[in-house]
Amino acid sequence: MKIYVWDNHTLRELLGISLILLLVGLGTVFSGNRCFLSCFLLVFSAKDQDYDKLCRFFFWFFFATLLLNLLLVGAGVLEDTLSTRWEAINFGATRHSYGFGHPNTFGFWTLLLIFSGLLYIPRKGHRALSCLISVLLAFCVFRVTDSKAALLSSLAAIVLCLIAFRVGPWLSSKKWSVPLCLGLYLLGIAAFLSLALLYREGSSFFSTCNALLSDRLAYSSAAFRSFGVKLFGAQVHFRWDPVDSLYAYAPICMGLIPTVLYFGLNLISIYRAAKAGRWDIVAVAFAGALYSTMEYGLMNPVHLPIFAACARLEVEKDRKSSV
């Protein structure tokens, strides 16, 4: 209702939004998964909302959720489910979930807290402290979850944000910076898909890449061969460990058209953030792209960079004007 009545869209914009929601809705019907539809609805509803306020809300929401879960585990209400790492890297490690059901889910929520914290505390005086706390949190959670995807993506976000804070004004002065970011984002997706589609078990190169990505290449390759890709997805029941990479899970389960629209939304977000000089948002978007090579959790409407597609962004150089 807000999108169509109160957001003051033009007729052309409303027709475009309606078409997108129709296509994503068809994908929801065929796949039985509402994640993409929820993403688009919430992002469209965020039109002209203050982006920094959204970051603040999500930060405290993620913080409260993590704290509540830990308290409930300590009180014996929730169970700390344990599992063992059976992959080559860190074989035999005990992994804790602390009330989230799976260690990777605990790592995912910590990742979301770090992402939102990096975007919520952008002031120069607080950047170093924010990054230091994020590093300590990432390693502490990794010690108990052994979630490599969450650790690597958290560290990537921290490093990229530090670089963005330093060279952001210089990047904003270069006309090639925005096309370069968009191209690199697409190149990363294309690289993973190429490796998955060309994957061969006997190759030492592919075996090394597969080990680094916690067997995601092998599972993705097998899924593409077994199930293929449909325009609007399907309710796929995997007979082996789930295909966790978003770049494989989305086209197979959610459908080609909804997947293209979703990543198109990500590209628009990166474009608007870069144009506004908000290179911290671009940095977190790239860290999220790294995480998506191993997990599909960011297909839920919790990845803050995608809200930059419609929300009001304060221009970094003066923090007064907005786009």
Model-inferred region functions:
Residues 21-64:
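Transmembrane alpha-helical segments and their membrane-water interfaces
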Residues 162-207:
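A membrane-periplasm/extracellular boundary helix in multi-pass inner-membrane enzymes
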Residues 1-22, 121, 315-323:
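Transmembrane signal-anchor hairpin modules in multi-pass inner-membrane enzymes, especially those
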